Structure formats: C-alpha cells, structure tokens
C-alpha cells in the first residue's frame, strides 16, 4: 500500500504518521520498521524517525524486546476522550443500559465513510452475545444498524 498522497495545505509527515497509526491499528500483530516502510514504499530511515516520535509520545509501544511496534496507550486515551466528550454518547448510553436490562443488547454507532463505526455496546444478559468492540467498523450492508442507516439515506 503506497503512502497516502497529501493534498494542498497538508503536512506530509503528519499524513505518514497517521498512515502508520492506521496500519498498526488494523494489524493484530506488531510490525517492524522495515515491514512498515515496505508497505508504504518509504525509506526505512524516514519510518524509523516517525515511529520514534510516535513511541516517545506514547502513541506506539515497542513489543517487548523485539524491534516491532503496536498501538500505544496514548492512542487509547485520545480515542477515549472523543467518546467522553460526545454529546451523542452521553445521551444514548442510559438508553443502552435500559435495553440491556430488558435482555436486548444495545449498540451505538455512527455513519462514517459509508461504514458504521461502533462507539459503544452494552451487552444484555440474554443467551446470545453479539458484540462490536468500540472503534470497530463494519460495512453498512452487513449489520442491522447499517441497514437502518442505509434506509434513511437519500439516493
């Protein structure tokens, strides 16, 4: 996957750092500098500097004694700040717990880039467990929430 092309007024280093964060967020296993550089067709020295900066800020963590990296605690904190400050989240969360107390699993999701991004799941005590971890993204056609969003969209 080539690095994202930056547009007018965008900062290439910031764009590349975001690309690295997205890659590591989507990957279950930690990745090394050379592998990341290869995926973006970038010099390893450039990727190394970006990773070092992201790691120093807590957005990436080195996996044990390896030379591989994964998402760090600071990325979690930034994402959590979004949810905590969301008026939608604050308004809907009590209703999700009401649903769960009535044996219905409740989901909060938003439409982003023609996908559903889940912000919260409150699991009921029912026999069937359907979960979407916060931050996960699904295609609109593959979930009931996505289909409900599609039904309300204009052609």
Tell what function each PLM region has.
Residues 1-85:
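N-terminal helix-turn-helix
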Residues 65-155:
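Amphipathic alpha-helical effector-binding/dimerization core
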């Amino acid at each position: 996957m080539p690095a994202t092309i930056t547009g007018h007024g965008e900062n290439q280093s910031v764009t590349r750092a975001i690309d690295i964060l997205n890659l590591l967020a989507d990957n279950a296993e930690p990745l090394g500098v050379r592998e990341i550089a290869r995926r973006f067709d970038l010099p390893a020295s450039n990727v190394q500097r970006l990773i070092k900066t992201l790691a120093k800020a807590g957005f990436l963590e080195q996996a044990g004694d390896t030379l591989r990296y994964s998402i760090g605690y600071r990325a979690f904190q930034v994402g959590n700040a979004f949810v905590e400050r969301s008026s939608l989240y604050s308004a809907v969360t009590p209703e999700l717990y009401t649903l769960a107390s009535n044996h219905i699993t409740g989901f909060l999701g938003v439409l982003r880039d023609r996908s559903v991004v889940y912000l919260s799941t409150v699991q009921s005590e029912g026999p069937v467990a359907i979960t979407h971890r916060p931050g996960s993204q699904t295609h609109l056609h593959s979930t009931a929430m996505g289909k409900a969003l599609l039904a309300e969209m204009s052609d």
